[in-house]
């Protein structure tokens, strides 16, 4: 048998990009054993407790249910992630077949995700007035659905980056006209999304006219894997991925801008 064995880093983006990388070579193997890297959980996520471990197992079970994947708990495998790909080439994830179901709403809408990772808060503050004005005008044409956290719980990993790098823009967009607020009350950095809410949010993104994200965190990774996505991202630990897959690419489904005006123009033209 030709067998590949890998552990996966536990960030949402890491899991999605690892899945895409492994999918790109899966026809070369009889079996691909995948395991969560629980050392990452112990170091950065342990305050989330058992519910987060259960959520990770659910996500692995959903994404790696087909052949040649075999779920494992073995911790001796080499670890891969979005930033440490081993010998694999970065590939854009596509998770629509795993999470897209019937429409949640029977009218057109645009999703705005509230969590930001990577783009410094001062850059969002420079963008905020134009961004809110653009969305206010857009709300005359589409409902605006808010997804994500109202308040980001600062776990051990987030504290390393700080609240100027990982934060929520909820207070900036919560009072937009024609808003449908599906944000989470809980601080997901120190709790865990429920399976029901996670699947609902992904399906909501999938059927949106577009999903808007700031930064390069899990919300962008999920959106770009399942929806038409308009993003603004400057700096951040995901820039390697953005540069390789999205910046200056002819991808009709995902745009990532560093120019605030260009970003807002894309939104205005929806």
Give the label of every model feature segment.
Residues 12-19, 129-242:
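Donor-binding and catalytic core of enzymes assembling or modifying cell-surface/extracellular glycoconjugates
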Residues 1-78, 202-205, 220-221:
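Active-site and donor-binding regions of nucleotide-sugar-utilizing enzymes
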Residues 63-116:
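A nucleotide-sugar donor-handling region in carbohydrate enzymes
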Residues 36-37, 110-118, 147-150, 235:
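Short loop/turn segments at strand-loop or loop-helix junctions that form parts
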Residues 39-46, 52-54, 119-121, 151-160, ...:
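Short, charged/polar "capping" segments at the starts of alpha-helices
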Residues 221-270:
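Nucleotide-sugar donor-binding patch of glycosyltransferase catalytic domains
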Residues 10-13, 40-41, 116-127, 152-153, ...:
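Short acidic, S/G/P-rich loop/turn micro-motifs used as interaction or catalytic elements
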Residues 5, 111-113, 213-216:
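Structural motif
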């Amino acid at each position: 048998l030709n067998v590949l064995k890998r552990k996966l880093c536990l960030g949402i983006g890491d899991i999605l990009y690892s899945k895409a990388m492994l999918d790109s070579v899966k026809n070369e193997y009889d079996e691909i054993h995948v395991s969560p890297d629980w050392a990452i959980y112990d170091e950065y996520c342990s305050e989330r407790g058992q519910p987060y471990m259960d959520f990770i197992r659910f996500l692995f079970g959903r994404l790696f249910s087909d052949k040649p994947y075999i779920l494992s708990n073995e911790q001796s495998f080499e670890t891969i992630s979005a930033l440490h790909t081993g010998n694999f080439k970065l590939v854009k994830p596509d998770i629509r077949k795993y999470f897209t179901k019937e429409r949640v709403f029977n009218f057109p809408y645009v999703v705005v995700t509230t969590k930001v990772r990577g783009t410094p808060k001062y850059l969002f503050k420079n963008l905020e007035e134009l961004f809110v004005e653009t969305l206010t005008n857009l709300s005359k044409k589409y409902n605006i659905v808010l997804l994500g956290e109202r308040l980001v719980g600062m776990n051990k990993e987030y504290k390393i980056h700080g609240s100027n790098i990982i934060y929520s823009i909820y207070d900036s967009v919560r009072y937009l006209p024609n808003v449908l607020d599906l944000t989470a009350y809980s601080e997901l950095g120190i709790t865990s999304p429920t399976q029901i809410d996670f699947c609902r949010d992904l399906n909501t993104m999938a059927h949106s006219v577009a999903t808007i994200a700031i930064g390069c965190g899990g919300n962008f990774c999920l959106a770009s894997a399942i929806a038409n996505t308009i993003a603004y991202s400057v700096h951040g630990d995901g820039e390697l991925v953005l540069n390789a897959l999205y910046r200056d690419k002819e991808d009709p489904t995902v745009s990532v801008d560093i120019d605030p005006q260009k970003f807002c123009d894309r939104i205005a033209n929806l």
